[in-house]
Amino acid sequence: MIAGMPALTHKQQQDAVERIQELMSEGMSSGQAIAQVAAEIRQEHQGDNVAVMFDEDDDTVNDSDEEHYFDDGEEEDEQ
């Protein structure tokens, strides 16, 4: 789920796509159409409770002592 957006049923998603396509056929840019439909959806669902689930790895909850490194595959330059 995108922050601030309610979870939508498949039918609601399909309706949103059709609304975006309708706005675009009237000459609106895709970005503007998406933003407008998102605002309409937020307005319709204002005050609704949205269930949020966070997926956390149990083994990394208290790993603040561990160091993490990123290997980009590049050789490091020696100075």
UniProtKB/Swiss-Prot annotation:
Pfam families, per database record: UPF0181
InterPro entries to which the protein is assigned, alphabetical: UPF0181 (IPR005371)
Region feature (Disordered): 54-79
Similarity remark: Belongs to the UPF0181 family.
Protein name in the entry: UPF0181 protein PC1_1931
